[in-house]
UniProtKB/Swiss-Prot annotation:
GO terms for biological process: potassium ion transport. This is Potassium/proton antiporter CemA. Signal peptide: none annotated. Contributes to K(+)/H(+) antiport activity by supporting proton efflux to control proton extrusion and homeostasis in chloroplasts in a light-dependent manner to modulate photosynthesis. Prevents excessive induction of non-photochemical quenching (NPQ) under continuous-light conditions. Indirectly promotes efficient inorganic carbon uptake into chloroplasts. It is a multi-pass membrane protein. It is found in: Plastid, Chloroplast inner membrane. Belongs to the CemA family. It comes from Gossypium barbadense. The keyword Transmembrane applies. Keywords: Antiport, Chloroplast, Hydrogen ion transport, Ion transport, Membrane, Plastid, Plastid inner membrane, Potassium, Potassium transport, Transmembrane, Transmembrane helix, Transport. It holds the Pfam family CemA. InterPro entries: CemA.
Amino acid sequence: MAKKKAFTPLLYLASIVFLPWWISLSFNKSLKSWITNWWDTRQSETFLNDIQEKSILEQFIEVEELFLLDEMIKEYPETHLQKLRIGIQKETIQLIKLHNEDHIHTILHFSTNLICFVILSGYSILGNEELLILNSWAQEFLYNLSDTIKAFSILLLTDLCIGFHSPHGWELMIGSIYKDFGFTHNDQIISGLVSTFPVILDTIFKYWIFRYLNRVSPSLVVIYHSMND
């Protein structure tokens, strides 16, 4: 009976780890065709408004300028001009397809992640008892560690997350989250998050040391500051 009680929280922890991957894989396959049909039906009349987006418009203008340049430099026969027009038409259709695929990809990933969040939230609420057991195990494990090990672990974690060498790691992680949600890579937004998010974490961490650790374990705070210096 005791082994069963110990096994249940571990099984619950493993399910939390693998459940997002399974949900993402399942819903990606089931939602893709539905979202594609919905997008093609809905956007068939409104694409001319969306094509004003900067990236698509720049590519379209580039193709058009190449056509006009060729027409100005040489006098082509009508058959050749017709081929150029067909080429521009094909390129425009390709741009439209890429535009639609990007939007479908964004909607699909955002919907999948939203569904995954809702399911995991409900799963966490239903498994509240298992979470309490896991939390008690974690607290017992941390309590049995010496203050030196605790201070070293805190210092290592803070250096990894908010140290001077952490921006590249934050950039990779935020870029990965952006890609997972299907958003287009944006250097300005990512740079802004990288420059502000670690600062916010650093402030929260210092406040936590001041309010919590100073009250619970003053010796740990002394060791931490000694190692940090």
